[in-house]
From Swiss-Prot:
First-level EC class: transferase
Family under the similarity heading: Belongs to the RNA polymerase beta chain family.
Protein name per Swiss-Prot or TrEMBL: DNA-directed RNA polymerase subunit beta
SUPFAM superfamilies for this protein: beta and beta-prime subunits of DNA dependent RNA-polymerase
Alphabetic keyword roster: DNA-directed RNA polymerase, Nucleotidyltransferase, Transcription, Transferase
One GO CC annotation: DNA-directed RNA polymerase complex
CDD domains (alphabetical): RNA_pol_B_RPB2
Gene Ontology BP terms: DNA-templated transcription
Segments crossing the lipid bilayer: none
UniProt source species: Anaplasma marginale (strain Florida)
EC number: 2.7.7.6
Gene name for this UniProt entry: rpoB
Reaction equations catalysed: RNA(n) + a ribonucleoside 5'-triphosphate = RNA(n+1) + diphosphate
Length: 1382
């Protein structure tokens, strides 16, 4: 079977279920294997959590291993983890949606409870009984048991989760990677503009550690953003002394006394830009550089090259230098100068006096090395380790006074214990690479060396070495996917369970305890349920169409727990970054306040095991582009020269040009082609799935491309799907990768096909052996999350041979395996009577008549039957006070029949609710006695269809509580479900039976078996039953053995089919678990047909959106010369200012595609002996230079006619992103189609028949109908709810609100002097409570009196003024009827 790109080979045939290969202008070669599974990001992440990963342990396993064993506080017993087991889901995905339950699997863990023999127990220690043989603790008893710890929501095959019957998606989150980050305030903190540097160590779990300079260049640290302390406190808390700190941060320079001064080693780097106050002399006393001369780095290097290794410093030249270690009087041991102190003139005298011959100085020159750590240390240089620990404790836990051991334990737990602090492997790798460390990856806590190196690097930044980190660089941001989120929640649940187990251990009698007594399965279930139900990243799946599903699963959000908030996110984090290239789409993002915070994964990008996004590139070796594809991280990419995919290469894949533009280090540079390391795999690798579906994307303004990407996700699946004539070649890929189509699991032959099932007999590659039966149950008229219709249709026929991953059934918005969100319509860009003012759209009535944009929407209505204190509610047909005509569409039970046409206020389910008995008046009792009328002691509580819905009932589900008697309708539904199970079972048995009996006949024939009474085997086979066949030829031992083996295999498969069937029936008969007090739930599904009408929103793929203003009769629409009316008129003024020229180019190419199809049709209709030759010749011209040209040449005449007939409606084109056809190529196609190469034609006015003055751009454009339907928005209210405070009607359709009569509307009435209307609007129609009651009374009485009182909003204003201590009183003056405010 061919894909949308076609397949070559001798005798090429286009199958009926294949899409016609597109005429593509792509030059680059796609790596299609990366596109087969677009939702791999979800699946891989979940599999890593639940399955076996690279280390041989899953995420679940590692959590259990970290938690167990659990010991009781006195060490008498221990609860050990042995293993875990994940069960099978109780119901399949379809059944969970239907029942409204969670699709989950039970998790059971095997625990071992060990109790030790003890001699004596005290709070200080436990004395154990020791086994004499092994010299180990003696076990009193050991109990092992498998325990359930709850259910884990399972990911479906579509990458979603079904929670309470609703499909949800866990969106991946972009967050700052664990590790260390260096930053500066960019001079914004202080008015002087001085840069203040800071560093932050971010763990995956645990306390944040910040380091920062202040304006005086003192270094401070903070823990969890609490009060800052000097960094010396932290270093001393780590056990470092003053000398240790100085040794760690400063190099030492040894000064040796000689006759003329101090002899010092000559270090080149110390003389960069230095101006000495004394002459620079060598050890011999020769002056090399005069005093006060600026020494540059070049001079210093020259002096070193000339052999200068030591120089002389005068005795007074050491003034102001910092001593590296204490200088001690050799005779008395008294300290002359303490470590870190500066040398003064007094000190110089003492040094000479005590004959100090050698001094170690700190290498601080105030230019390349500053005294920042030293100054910080001298803030409190006498502080001890204990003082530092207590000071840190006081900041974090103020108000407590603990002992030293508690303080040490607390400090150790902050950063150095894995239970409370976890950098994660990612954090450790980032820390190692940033700081040049070589710490083992499994060390996920901080070390002393880490902290010292962070401070060192911060000091180097202040000294002018290195650069700060870019937090928006994708090397510093990682993706947290679904598996990681669930793992974190799982860990939280297990930790809560651990605490409960430890509490229980302290109070339980061990002799009677079993492992199950310690575990409460609700703990984990509650945590997981909260996450899936209420987390910001667990979202109701966008299921409008297949594209919206795929996009939602590939979405990346910077919001959510541990992420940003939209209010605090600045411009930088939202902006496109150079590292987004090939990783995050620069186009697709929301338009509102979430812009830039929510983005989409680029089409070829994938996420590695550490959560960083990788992009693929083709390796270049010696100017030759190889087929080797390598995935690079953002951090790696900057080191290489990467050329664009559009770089010209010859037939040997060698670069044609000597110089190429490349990306390197975030910039574009021109380099020699020999230096190029990689080349992009495809021009479209920078965009997302949605953006890759926009033809001529490169001709559109980015803002409009963004709208186009977003609006494709809002397109409603139409009644009949139609693939675009002008696509991008990605339509097939997106459809196959979305899960909306049904793909064949294995090679095989279609054995049976109908509207609901496809049965395929699967074979091995050589078609020799049957591997089994694949039964595909199609989704028929199911309701999506957004009320659109999901309906799968088979595209294969009986007997078709299909290969693995072939499309065998289309879904909604799919046409022969290609994504089909809209329709190809004939468009004219012109104005028409002002009806296309401001992007309005004019539509032909013919489009409505042909149901071109008609869509089916499925509404779900639910009726709940409860048990009330007065008795149970009942579903019944005889509803009080309802005439028989209104009940005609209900069955005997009282539930609407499938197929019934229902409209506003139709009863869907008849239901009555008991009410308290009422005492009847005497006259009613008399009537009851005389006529025997039944008095209802119940009220009508039936399910009525809402006023804005009209449609056909397509399905009814009845759920009856287990133990409650089922009604006839639920029994009928159950019987139909069992029938479908029987059908599935029989399909499987039929296929297997047919295969095995064929194999049996072949075996008997090959063995030459003779059957008594038959001349040959064929006549025997024609008459023999299946049972007779199995007993034939058993006299031959070899044949009998083979037959026995075959029979065992056959019986095994048939037995398995029967077992599955019985399992399904048992589950169905088990009944339903309904909420407390609910007896029955009835769900009614109504299919509503939405025709196109004024007010509906439509759009193209280029951000060209508009609302239908008028549906014009087809005869009045402008028409072509042959009388064909245009389908749609767009305003030509909507193109220049929006700069989305792609729609015009699409129109031209669509015009060429249709006219080429018409020309092919004319050749076919003409017939004649030369037809095949003419056809081949014309198709050769169309597909000139295409791979498909050779396929067409290899076609037989019959195959060619089939292919040509499929092209009658138009030749499908592909204009891939950034590789669309140029003007000349479009003009060439227009000329080939024998139409004006300008793409414009003369149109005729349908009303007058006159030709328009000038030519008009006409062609075919792909238009989408969006989910903003006027039927869902139109709303009216007469009486409804009012606001509690203002007493004004609520607003909006969802609240059944009124229309706001605002300030400007009041001005309009004032302008016309409509005083009474204005008064009415502001009082009785709004918030005059007394007035509206009086109006109601006067209407009932038939009066025309009109009285209005004080509006409630006035009272609210008075109350607000009183709250400001302004007493406003309304006084009634005797002389005046109006009130005055005092």
């Amino acid at each position: 079977m061919s894909s949308a790109g076609g397949s070559s080979g001798p005798g090429y045939v286009l199958n009926d279920f294949d899409a016609v290969p597109r005429l593509s202008y792509a030059k680059s070669i796609d790596i299609r294997d990366s596109l087969t599974d677009l939702i791999r990001i979800q699946r891989d992440s979940y599999d890593a959590f639940i399955g076996i990963d690279r280390d041989g342990s899953s995420g679940i396993q590692s959590i259990f291993e970290a938690m167990f064993p659990i010991r009781d506080l006195l060490g008498r017993a221990v609860l050990e983890f042995v293993g875990y087991n994940i069960g099978e889901p109780q119901y399949d995905e379809y059944e969970c949606i239907k029942r409204g339950i969670t699709f989950s699997v039970p998790i059971r863990i095997t625990l071992r409870f060990v109790v030790w023999k003890v001699q004596e127990v005290s709070f200080k220690e436990v004395k154990y009984v020791v086994d004499e043989d092994t010299s180990e603790r003696s076990v009193k008893y050991m109990k092992e048991q498998e325990v359930s710890i709850g259910d884990l929501p399972m990911m479906t095959s579509y990458g979603t989760f079904i929670i309470n019957g609703i499909e949800r998606v866990i969106v991946s989150q972009m967050h700052r990677s664990p590790g260390v980050f260096f930053d500066s305030d960019k001079g914004k903190t202080y008015s002087s503009g001085k840069l203040i540097y800071s560093a932050r160590v971010i763990p995956y779990r645990g306390s944040w550690l910040d380091f920062e300079f202040d304006i005086k260049d003192i270094i401070y640290f903070r823990i969890d953003k609490k009060r800052k302390l000097p960094v010396s406190y932290l270093l001393k808390a780590l056990g470092m002394s003053n000398n240790d700190i100085l040794d760690a941060f400063y190099d030492k320079v040894i000064y040796t006394r000689c006759d003329k001064g101090w002899r010092v080693p000559f270090i080149v780097d110390r003389f960069k830009g230095v101006r000495l106050s004394y002459d620079l002399m060598d050890v011999d006393g020769s002056v090399l550089v005069k005093a006060n001369t600026r020494i540059t780095l070049r001079i210093a290097k020259k002096l070193y090259a000339d052999g200068l290794r030591e120089y002389m410093v005068p005795f007074s030249g050491i003034t102001g230098m910092f001593v590296a270690a204490d200088l001690v009087d050799p005779s008395s041991g008294a300290v002359i100068v303490s470590a870190g102190e500066t040398i003064t003139s007094e000190h110089i005298v003492k040094l000479e006096l005590f004959d100090i011959s050698e001094i170690a100085f700190l290498n601080i020159d105030f230019l390349t090395v500053g005294p920042y750590v030293l100054n910080t240390l001298f803030l409190d240089k006498n502080m001890t380790q204990e003082d530092a620990l207590f000071e840190i404790y006081r900041v974090l836990r103020s108000g407590e006074s603990p002992n030293l051991d508690a303080v040490k334990s607390f400090f150790k737990g902050l950063f150095f214990e894995s239970e409370r602090y976890d950098l994660s492997v990612v954090g450790r790798i980032k820390l190692n690479s940033h700081l040049g460390l070589d710490v083992d990856e499994n060390t996920t806590v901080l070390t002393k060396e880490d902290i010292v190196q962070v401070v060192k690097k911060l000091v180097l930044l202040r000294d002018g070495e290195g650069v700060v980190d870019d937090i928006d660089h994708l090397g510093n941001r990682r993706v947290r996917s679904v598996g990681e989120f669930i793992e974190n929640q799982f860990r939280i649940g297990i930790l809560r369970l651990e605490r409960m187990i430890m509490d229980y251990m302290s109070s339980v009698n061990f002799d009677n305890a079993m492992p199950c007594d310690f575990v409460n399965p609700k703990v984990l279930a509650t945590v997981l349920k909260d996450f899936f139900s209420s987390s910001q990243l667990s979202q109701f799946m966008d299921q409008t169409n297949p594209l919206s599903e795929v996009t939602h699963k590939r979405r990346l959000s910077a919001l959510g727990p541990g992420g940003l908030t939209r209010e605090r996110a600045g411009f930088e984090v939202r902006d496109v970054h150079p590292t987004h290239y090939g990783r995050i789409c620069p186009i697709e993002t929301p338009e509102g306040q979430n812009i830039g915070l929510i983005s989409s994964l680029a089409i070829y990008a994938k996420i590695n095991k550490y959560g960083f996004i990788e992009s693929p590139y083709r390796k270049v070796e010696n100017r030759v582009v190889t087929d080797k594809v390598e995935y690079l991280l953002a951090m790696q990419e900057g080191d290489y020269y990467i050329a664009d995919a559009g770089a010209a290469i010859d037939e040997n894949n060698r670069f044609v040009d000597d110089m190429l533009y490349c990306r390197h280090g975030g910039n574009f540079v021109m380099v020699k082609s020999e230096d190029v390391d990689y080349v992009d795999v495809s021009p479209k690798q920078i965009v997302s799935v949605a953006a890759s579906l926009i033809p001529f994307l490169e001709n559109n303004d980015a803002n409009r491309a963004l709208m186009g990407s977003n609006m494709q996700r809002q397109a409603v699946p139409l009644l009949k799907s139609e693939a675009p004539l002008v696509g991008t070649g990605m339509e097939f890929v997106v459809a196959a990768g979305s899960g909306a189509v049904v793909l064949a699991k294995r090679d095989g032959i279609v054995h049976r096909v109908d509207g609901s099932y496809i049965v395929i007999r699967a074979f091995d590659a050589n078609k020799d052996e049957c591997l089994g039966v694949d039964i595909y149950r199609l989704r028929k008229f199911q309701r999506s999350n957004h009320n659109t219709c999901i309906n799968q249709r088979p595209v294969v026929k009986l007997g078709d041979y299909v290969k693995a991953n072939d499309v065998i059934a289309d879904g909604s918005a799919i046409d022969r395996g290609e994504l089909a969100l809209g329709k190809n319509v004939l468009v004219a860009f012109m104005s028409w009577q002002g009806y296309n003012f401001e992007d309005s759209i004019v539509i032909s009535s013919d489009v409505v008549k042909r149901d071109v944009f008609t869509s089916i929407h499925i509404e779900e209505f639910e009726c709940v039957v409860r048990d009330t204190p007065l008795g149970p509610e009942k579903i019944m047909r005889s509803v009080p006070d309802v005439n028989e005509e209104s009940l005609s569409h209900l069955d005997d039970v009282g539930i609407v029949n499938i197929g019934a046409e229902v409209s506003a206020s139709s009863i869907l389910v008849g239901k009555v609710t008991p009410r308290p008995p009422v005492s009847l008046p005497p006259e009613t009792k008399l009537l009851v006695t005389i006529f025997g009328e039944k008095v209802f002691d119940c009220v009508d509580s039936s399910l009525y269809l809402p006023p804005d819905v009209e449609g056909t009932v397509i399905d009814v589900h009845v759920f009856v509580r287990r133990g409650v008697e089922e009604n006839d309708r639920s029994l009928l539904i159950k019987q139909s479900e069992i029938s479908s199970f029987v059908k599935e079972r029989d399909y499987e048995i039929d296929v297997v039976s047919e295969y095995f009996h064929d194999e049996l006949r072949k075996l008997l024939r090959n063995a030459g078996v003779k059957v008594k009474g038959y001349s040959d085997l064929d006549s025997f086979f024609a008459e023999a039953s299946d049972d007779t066949l199995w007993s034939t030829g058993l006299a031959d031992a070899k044949v009998a053995a083979k037959v026995k083996d075959m029979r065992e295999r056959f019986d095994s498969i048939v037995g398995e089919a029967h077992r599955k069937f019985e399992q399904k029936v048992d589950k169905l008969n088990y009944g339903y678990d309904l909420p407390q007090g609910v007896l029955t739930i009835v769900k009614v599904f109504v299919a509503v047909k939405h025709n196109l009408q004024p007010g509906d929103k439509m759009a193209g793929r280029h951000g060209n959106k508009g609302v239908i203003s008028r549906i014009v009769p087809a005869e009045d629409m402008p028409h072509l010369e042959d009388g064909t009316p245009v389908d749609i008129i767009l305003n030509s003024l909507g193109v220049p200012s929006r700069m989305n020229i792609g729609q015009i180019l699409e129109t031209h190419l669509g015009w060429a595609a249709v006219n080429l199809g018409k020309k092919i049709g004319r050749i076919l209709d003409k017939g004649g002996p030369s037809m095949i030759a003419d056809l081949r010749d014309f198709l050769d011209k169309i597909y000139d230079g295409q791979k498909l040209k050779s396929d067409i040449a290899s076609m037989s005449s019959e195959a060619l006619l089939v292919f040509a007939n499929r092209l009658r409606k138009g030749v499908p084109m592909a204009a891939p992103v950034f590789e669309g056809p140029k003007d000349a190529q479009i003009s060439k196609l227009l000329e080939l189609a024998e139409v004006d190469p300008s793409g414009q034609v003369y149109l005729y006015d349908g009303r007058l028949g006159k030709k328009f003055d000038r030519k008009i751009t006409v062609g075919y454009i792909y238009m989408l109908k969006l989910h903003h339907l006027v039927d869902d928005k139109i709303h009216a209210r007469s009486v409804g709810p009012y606001g509690l405070v203002t007493q004004q009607p609520l607003g909006g359709k969802s609240h059944f609100g009124g229309q706001r009569f605002g300030e400007m509307e009041c001005w309009a009435l004032q302008a016309y002097g409509a005083a009474y209307t204005l008064q009415e609007m502001l009082t009785v129609k709004s918030d005059d409570i007394v007035g509206r009651v009086k109006i109601y009374e006067s209407i009932i009485k038939g009066d025309s009196n009109f009285e209005c009182g004080i509006p409630e909003s006035f009272n609210v204003m008075v109350k607000e003024l009183r709250s400001l201590c302004l007493n406003v009183v309304l006084k009634q003056d005797k002389e005046f009827t109006s009130g005055e405010v005092e």
